[in-house]
Each structure stands twice: as structure tokens, then as C-alpha cells.
Amino acid sequence: VFCRSNGQQCTSDGQCCYGKCMTAFMGKICMR
């Protein structure tokens, strides 16, 4: 499954390689 690294924008389903999808001022990004 395609996933995003920390600091990258989450996919629409919130798929992160590690960490969680969090809402930030720049949109949703993957964070630990």
C-alpha cells in the first residue's frame, strides 16, 4: 500500500508509513 513519510501530506484515507495523520496549518500531514 502506498504511504507517506513524516512531514508529507496524508493521502485522503490518512495512510502514513509510521505515525498518524494530523491536521496542521498547511493541511493534513503525517506526524509521529
Curated annotation (Swiss-Prot):
Q: What is its main location?
A: secreted
Q: What does this protein do?
A: Acts as a neurotoxin.
Q: Does the keyword Disulfide bond apply?
A: yes
- Name its species: Phoneutria nigriventer
Its cellular-component GO annotations read:
extracellular region
The disulfides recorded in the entry are C3-C17, C10-C21, C16-C30
One GO MF annotation is: toxin activity
Localization terms from the record: Secreted
**InterPro entries, per this entry?**
Toxin_29
What family does this belong to? Belongs to the neurotoxin 17 (21C2) family.
- Tissues where the protein occurs: Expressed by the venom gland.
Q: Which Pfam families match?
A: Toxin_29 (PF08116)
Q: Which keywords describe this protein according to UniProt?
A: Disulfide bond, Knottin, Neurotoxin, Secreted, Toxin
For domains, the record's comment is: The presence of a 'disulfide through disulfide knot' structurally defines this protein as a knottin.
- This protein is called U13-ctenitoxin-Pn1a
